[in-house]
Amino acid sequence: IDESQTSLDTGVQRFTSSKIASSVQCFEDTKARIVKLIHKPELSVSTYDTAWVAMVPSPNSSNEPCFPDCLAWLLENQCCDGSWACPHHHPFLKKDVLSSTLACILALKKWGVGEEQINKGARFIEVNFASATEKSQISPTGFDIIFPAMLDYARDLFLDLRLEPTTFDNLIFRRDLELKRCYESHREAYLAYIAEGMGKLQDWESVMKYQRKNGSLFNSPSTTAAAFIALPNSGCLSYLHSALKKFGNAVPAAYPLDVYSRLRTVDNLESLGISRYFQKEIQQVLDETYRWWLQGSEEIFLDASTCALAFRTLRMNGYNVTSDAITKLLPDSFCGNMKDIGTTLELYRASEFILYPDEKDLEQQNLRLKDILEQELSSGFIHSEVNRALNYPFYAIMDRVAKRRNIEHYNFDNTRILKTSYCSPNFANKDFLFLSVEDFNNCQAMHREELKGKMRWVTENRLDELKFARSKSAYCYFSAAATFFAPDLSDARMSWAKNGVLTTVVDDFFDVGGSEEELKQLIRLVEIWDLDAITECSSQNVQIIFSSLKRTISEIGDKGFKLQGRSVTNHIIEIWLDLLYSMMKEAEWARDNHAPPMDDYISNAYVSFALGPIVLPCLYLVGPKLSEEMVRHSECHTLFRLMSTCGRLLNDIQTCERELKDGKLNAIPLYMINSGGETSKEAATQEMKSLIDRQRQELLRLVLTREGSLLPKPCKELFWHMSTVLHLFYCKDDGFTSQDLIKVVNEVIHEPVVLN
């Protein structure tokens, strides 16, 4: 029996080891595919655009095609049903398929080839013609103008299409209505973009003013081809040759698109929480993008989505980019239409990154875009994305919470719509999702083990015996795990969480648990820093609190010493003493019924809010080596002050009524008192909210700015992480009591991501 059991155990071990090895290899293979995508973006070809390129006549003879290989490609790529649908064809993209199919048979008919394919294509259009006016179908950009124009061209080529008259009349009515709207709103750029749909109405000389340095019109092969057909131009021809040289015998819907594709990949990796696996590749993309930004690259600045994405990505990664380019991108100037919610959403996200007081235009744009998104919530997969962007601004959602929501709502359908549909695995794909789910669940398993250790620490230090103290151990750990989650930051998480518990205990001790003498005893013990100084006159509560402080601070100090190569314990003690002194001052103000001047209150309250012991010791544990000069520098203190002031005021707004009843100091009534009673509660609250906005804006600027900064980025990010924690905790109730928060804690720590 023993031998059989041993054999069974060995077999299980081999199976388990093999399974782990296979999983690791799968993980590595996925990473390798993503790296390849970053270096070499992929983009689908477009039958619609290829058809228009195929219509281009040779510069040497108008009776011969300039690109016969495109014609051959069309002949070889017709679908069995007679259409020229793309592989990513969606049932709601029938208008796109109709448009592409009609363009293809026009190209074949023009050059007198492929009669069989033309007949099959014509039959498909006739059978599916009703879809051209169905409201449930997604309309490609300019469809209502371009499709009727191509039908006119089909008639000129004597292409016999038996179309249902009512649907045809409806199409013509829509075209005329759309053209009228465009002319009335002076949408010249939009009409130039869909120039192939304007026919004889088009002023091609005016269209050519939109020609780019690469010879194209709007980086669109179809627009450029139509322009060359109407008005031969060497730049247009050179552009078409370059597109075919890159893609073979067919062209994409937009080219070049490398900048956008790479940035979209980076955005995917960052939003799903897996960017740390690709730091080298991402840095290369960011540096290249910044170089193109400084050079005024048309690929960035002449496309609203690319410009917005580049601005947001560069600014959030510390690059010095001004907002001028973004504020010039007004919603009604998009080269498309205002139903392009994707571009609107991209611009809205970019406009949230306001760093300077003089960026009023960016503020105004943010408000305008928010109104547009609220009024025109789109249907389909992007609907939930818009809701999340509006309900959870980037400064009010913790990193891991955002990552989980992004994973759960991730749509790996990478189809996008311009004048036709196109797709790219750089926009979205299953590899991104697989890697993010694996990583999230692996990190979460580690977090659960850390939380168990944290709960043991509470018991070992007898903190559970303090009846006056709120039990917030899980929440304190959650705020750490939800902000800096990587496996190598375990020591920083535990320091954050343990000090979070201790500050809660001390805060409750000063509020309700301790007498004046006990408070003074605790401060004296921390000043002396000697366990032997705990005498019989010290209460049990004081003994438990000080012993816990002594052990925990010493433990964190030891870990800090190993990472920093110097002693940091005295600095951590000093941080705690600053907190205790500020709490004592508040206790004295309350005891004396004293209402201090607002400035005095704020200068003490941002310290007494108790974030110092939570955040500042973590600076030593997140990786970079810090000199004494760095941690004592005004930059570090300013970051701490801004973060803590935001937190204190957020708390005061939410707890005003309760703290008034409890006789505690609060910024709202103090502001009213200091104004001589001339300010209402509503006005005082609004002023505090405005102050929070200004402080948060300055905090973000300091965190993101690299030039002239002494603190390393991982250290500065701790202050921003805590700011997001505070905005979530105090967004509704007084933080800890919110049922929403309980749900979020479970999602981050206890419930693995399971995909259907």
Swiss-Prot record:
InterPro entries: Isoprenoid_synthase_dom_sf, Terpene_cyclase_plant_C1, Terpene_synth_N, Terpene_synth_N_sf, Terpene_synthase-like, Terpene_synthase_metal-bd, Terpenoid_cyclase/PrenylTrfase. Keywords: Chloroplast, Lyase, Magnesium, Membrane, Metal-binding, Plastid, Transmembrane, Transmembrane helix. Gene3D superfamilies: 1.50.10.160, Farnesyl Diphosphate Synthase, Terpene synthase, N-terminal domain. One of its GO terms (biological process) is gibberellin biosynthetic process. Mg(2+) 1 binds at D507, D511. GO terms for cellular component: chloroplast membrane. The chain crosses the membrane at residues 606-622. Belongs to the terpene synthase family. This is Ent-kaurene synthase, chloroplastic. It comes from Marrubium vulgare. The lineage of its organism: Eukaryota, Viridiplantae, Streptophyta, Embryophyta, Tracheophyta.
